[in-house]
A protein has these predicted regions:
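Extracytoplasmic
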Residues: 3-35, 63, 222-229, 344
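Conserved MFS/SLC helix-loop-helix module at the cytosolic interface between two early adjacent transmembrane helices
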Residues: 61-97
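Structural signature of the two symmetry-related core transmembrane helices
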Residues: 77-91, 270-285
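Intracellular juxtamembrane helix-capping segments at the cytosolic ends
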Residues: 115-128, 308-322
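Cytoplasmic helix-loop-helix junction between adjacent transmembrane helices
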Residues: 105-141
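Extracytoplasmic gate region of multi-pass secondary transporters
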Residues: 22-23, 203-253
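Helix-loop-helix hairpin linking two adjacent transmembrane segments in secondary transporters
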Residues: 130-131, 135-186
């Protein structure tokens, strides 16, 4: 089963690349899809931002089915669907002749993402029964490793004069091979749908708040992840792609710390209050202190507090409300997360269009507002959880 969990975590390693690679290759993709150059000579990358947002749309379309499907027909099927869709996404984006085709493949990528979510999270929580929160954090850990390595891979590909498509193709092939393994590896035994009496999902206010943290926590890091490069340029940072590596190191550190904190007995819900609070303060600092170093510090801190598994802990916290329907609980939080991905990034794309050079700072304010709402939600869950459990 350990091998199974490694094969599953590997899909997230590739997913880490899939989730952030379009953001790193915005100008190349935009040029390939026939974007116009802006007045200052840079490419108009707003169409790429829209395509990235379509990943959220794809997740949204498929999540209502993927959770129940995984709970009912088994995790393996869900994983295989995810892998096939992911391989299609990488190849599709790499060779898409136009934005329209890319948009369609991004939706397929989103579908892949949601089937992996409802396969990997519940399976790893079932393999490591004693530490489900920690098992779930490791999905994030795998993504983190690949997002940390991605800037180096991009540099390597560029140095070797290979096409920007190289990483897409390699990643697509790798996840396909991994899928073949998943097809044959053993999965944990589960009490099948027959024995469990169908519990009707009761969504209490606190459970709803826990689900909505999926929205706010995703917005915090999505906005940062997709808009930090522009902020770095605005603050005259010499190499804005460094922010990405600082961010990954922060996430890395947070996952290890959170795992230790949880083992030591810190409640997940407290992390859901403390981390967003740290993000909120950091975003404020990035807004008021306009110098290049703050972007790197911000990258690390947002990586730590924004992306360091808050979303995964929201999943574990929500799963406590629905012990019999972990797959469905996962998809509820991820639905909230995808709505965030789609709406907030579409809004960010719009701000980027109308805001001109001050757009990156306007996006920081948007991010602060959403993050603040997340803190309030977590406080609400903390106060009401005991009454309902």
């Amino acid at each position: 089963l350990v091998i199974t969990s490694i094969a599953l975590y590997f899909t997230y390693f590739i997913h880490g690349i899939g989730a952030s690679i379009m953001g790193q290759y915005k100008p190349e993709l935009a040029a390939h899809w026939g974007a116009k150059a802006l007045s200052d000579g840079t490419m108009d990358v707003s169409m790429v931002v829209s395509v990235i947002a379509a990943l959220g749309l794809g997740r949204l379309i498929s999540l209502p089915f993927s959770g129940p499907l995984s709970d009912k027909f088994g995790r393996r099927l869900s994983g295989i669907i995810g892998v096939i869709c992911y391989a299609a996404y990488f190849m599709g984006i790499a060779f898409a002749p136009s934005m329209g085709v890319a948009y369609a493949f991004a939706i397929v990528g989103g579908i892949a993402n949601s089937f992996l979510d409802t396969c990997v999270s519940p399976t790893c929580m079932e393999i490591y029964v004693n530490n489900p929160s920690v098992a779930n954090l490791f999905t994030k850990f795998s993504m983190c490793i690949s997002q940390f390595l991605l800037p180096f891979l991009i540099g390597f590909v560029a140095a070797a004069n290979m096409s920007y498509r190289t990483i897409f193709i390699v990643a697509g092939a790798a996840i396909f091979i991994d899928g073949i393994l998943i097809l044959f590896l053993p999965f944990p035994e589960r009490n099948t749908a027959g024995t469990v009496k169908k519990e009707k999902l009761k969504i209490t206010p606190a459970a709803l708040a826990a689900i909505l943290i999926g929205f706010t926590s995703s917005s915090t890091f999505m906005l940062w992840l997709n808009c930090n490069q522009e902020l770095g340029k605005l603050y005259n940072l010499s190499d804005p792609s460094k922010i990405q590596s600082f961010y990954a190191v922060g996430t890395f550190a947070a996952i290890l710390c959170s795992s230790v904190f949880i083992k030591k007995g810190l409640k997940e819900i407290n992390i859901l209050i403390i981390y967003p609070l740290i993000s909120f303060i950091m975003l404020g600092l990035c807004y008021f202190i306009q110098n290049p170093t703050i972007c790197l510090i911000g990258g690390f801190v947002i990586g730590f507090a924004g992306a360091g598994g808050v979303l995964q802990l929201a999943v574990s916290t929500t799963a406590e409300f629905f012990p019999e329907n972990k797959g469905t609980a996962t998809s509820l939080v991820m639905i909230a997360s995808s709505i965030a991905n789609y709406t907030i990034l579409s809004l960010a794309g719009y701000i980027t269009k109308v805001g001109g050079s001050s757009a990156p700072r306007m996006i920081l304010l948007l991010n602060m507002a959403v993050t603040f709402i997340g803190i309030l939600l977590a406080l609400f869950v903390k106060m009401n959880r005991g009454k309902e459990a």
